[in-house]
Amino acid sequence: EVHSDRYFKPHFQSQPVTKDKEQDLYDRIARALMLTDVEREHLFLLGLGRAPEVRYHRSEGVTPRLQRVLDLLEPHPAIIRTATWDVVAWNRAATVMLTDYGALPPRERNVLRFMFLDPRVRAAQHDWASVARFVVGAFRVDAARAGAAAEVQPFVDELCRLSPEFAALWRDNDVRAHGEAIKQLRHPILGPVRFEYSAFAVDGRSDLSMIVYNPVDPEVKEKIRGLMEASPAHEHA
């Protein structure tokens, strides 16, 4: 068994120790040993007593198993989104109640794009101004937590150019937590509907979150089933 105190820490005894130097040494060890992300994190916890700085990995999709989980949640709308709020998976209930993600190019499947650039999504919000402020604040937190601040900057710059409202909210530097709450929508067919929503981390995929929407009114579930039966099916991605 390799003990990190014995083999790694003496490297620093004859020179000033900085966080960057420690991070660099342990990163080099992890690369030399070809450690997985989980093994790399364990190495840092053993040697430094803390997790390493987050390394962001862009997600392009989900496994078939995760997609089956989403499908089994129907008629509850559910999506999986990245730390940069790109929607990478969804079920048919989400298609009929939220957005027809399958009809959009992958680049356009972003919650902030919907919120600030799609008039239909804006009109569907019960209180667009409050929802928009929450979305921007929660997005800022998620991107920073995932170590994706640099990756999202071009997207943020683009959205600032396209939406003065987004630009103003971004300048406010507000931060929000994404947990559990009530979402109210104006659906074009069902009218006003309310959902309890919860956000869940996807185990082993720190870059992904699953959002599940539970209808507050029980009769809405059967109405969602009816919409699903009447709507053509799209590919998941």
Each model region followed by its residue ranges:
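Recognition helix of helix-turn-helix/homeodomain-like DNA-binding domains
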Residues: 2-20, 30
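Functionally constrained cores in energy, signaling, and assembly domains
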Residues: 2-3, 26, 47-49, 76, ...
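Small/flexible residues
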Residues: 8, 42, 185-189
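Short, flexible active-site loop motifs that bind/organize anionic cofactors or intermediates
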Residues: 16, 30-33, 85, 180
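Residues at alpha-helix boundaries and short interhelical turns
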Residues: 16, 33-37, 102-105, 146
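Short amphipathic recognition helices of helix-turn-helix/homeodomain-type DNA-binding modules
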Residues: 21-61
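Hydrophobic protein-protein interaction segments
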Residues: 59, 64-237
